[in-house]
Amino acid sequence: MKVGIVLNPHAGGGFDDLKRRVVVRVLKKLDGEFVTADKVAELLGIEAERVKVKETNTRLDTVNLVKALDGNVDVIAVFGGDGTVSDAASAKPQTPLLCIGIGTTNVSPALCPPDFDRLEEVEMRGLVVKFGGEERVAFNDVVVGSTILSTVDGKRVQVDARRYMRGEKVIATPRKFRARVEVGERVVEGVFGNIFVAMTDRRFLGKGIAGGASLSAFLGFKGVVACVSEGIVVSTYTKEDLRRVEPIVTSTISFDDEVVKIDADEVVSCDGNPLGVGRAEVAIEDGVVRVLKPFKEEE
């Protein structure tokens, strides 16, 4: 079996010995012939067939390497965070992905735990985002807001999204912004702290505390938009900080096959990857990519 290897050494604050051990352990389980880029082979210290890709030190390193490996290997092993998984899927490969989390949050439903035994191929539903003439794939959510989560000095913190796009990691508190969201004839417009677009999840079922998202899941809607009065993409708040901004009010809109149109004067992010400020369109698409997940016996 030929195994393509994609590694984001910047995920989760950097590549260390602990992460290297995780990667090597997974590769030993796969027990195949490895194919990857020069830089990845050197970082891991492995024997591998090399493919030539232009190094940019940006997300394009992931996208371009996935494209170079697609169709030339049996599986593409992707090591990184949720944003790396999004970038790999955005290349729309035909070859299945095995995604292992070594990032900041590691909550993407496309991820596979590193201690897997048997694997099976699964088709993934995803959020397809159109922004600035580009198309991206997200599995967690599309978020509008002034902060994103990142790792600074080994700690998970919220950083300013605009400055992050300029290569700076600066801890910041959320700013409010004006935005308009359209789903068909339904419109929400105003000043918000965050806007989230996500696929519904069975975990919302029976959880009335989740508000409108609980009913969206119960009725079988594919997705839901949540416009939140305060910025909640934070990880450094104390109880007193939360008390200070409460009450927090959320307005939701459910959707199936409609296109969610967002016009905002704050940063749009795709699974933690900031895209820019402006207009975005989001839709849910089945079978955006195939991934390997732990095998489940039929009940």
Curated annotation (Swiss-Prot):
Gene3D superfamilies per UniProt: Probable inorganic polyphosphate/atp-NAD kinase, domain 1
Kindly give the Pfam families that the UniProt entry links to this protein. NAD_kinase
GO molecular function ontology, one term from the record: NAD+ kinase activity
* InterPro entries in UniProt: ATP-NAD_kinase_N (IPR017438), NAD/diacylglycerol_kinase_sf (IPR016064), NADK (IPR002504)
This protein's source sits in the domain of life called Archaea
Which Gene Ontology terms describe the biological processes this protein takes part in?
Answer: NADP biosynthetic process
| The name this protein goes by in its record | Uncharacterized protein AF_0748
